């Protein structure tokens, strides 16, 4: 198992220390004195962002999936054609310099829609000040991916009167990540740590199966493994994969299945998980199951992300790979011209 010395030696910028503080960061963001902004008669919300910022849009898309508000996520340059005066476009770029999101911001400003931006500075701040766009400037904490809860709970606070998300549900999610920390943080580097146990199990390429409601957790886990552990990872919708992807298991491979499950998944989804487990057992394919905590959808997803992000950090340390540098991303950015 990983030791404290290993974390400090490999994780040179101390990413894990930020994750140890996630509950306090979330609480501080939601309790901030930031003024709420209300947008009336909104029936369509567009979340635009890339990478760690884009994961925030995935989260809100899942949370609002059963509301009367249609949610679009944009991970690229183009807004949906359905944007109108009843649309709220939320652009998030932790760095404030994301080329794609700056383009969306500029295009949204030209339309008859509502608009707000969240960032830590950069060109997005300059644009919003110059063009009188509502915005919130937030702290960058280590990296965009580590800043996830700071931005998520700041958005929940700022748009509390616009987003149909109960305050009690938000507070529940913070309580639960506080409880989760007791099991997965660096203060519990033992076999009882589920994040560390999963990290120790991974040796090949993880294939993450998810039910539709937990899609944002799966997307985030894939990205965290890619950025932190510098390894490939695959995600598949459980139900869809049973109509195609499952056939690939007929050949030997280094792929390792991980099943993400909710405590109260739809009955047909539960049945399908049991069927695919039966298939894996019959064919001697080792797999892992990861269950969400109980609670509202925000609570479930945030806690899964917390556990799985930590898994990616532990896996990177076990692989002797510093989780912080993302040199390949910097290469791409250096050749991308912002508008």
Language-model features: locations:
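A generic structural motif
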Residues: 71-76, 231-242, 286-295
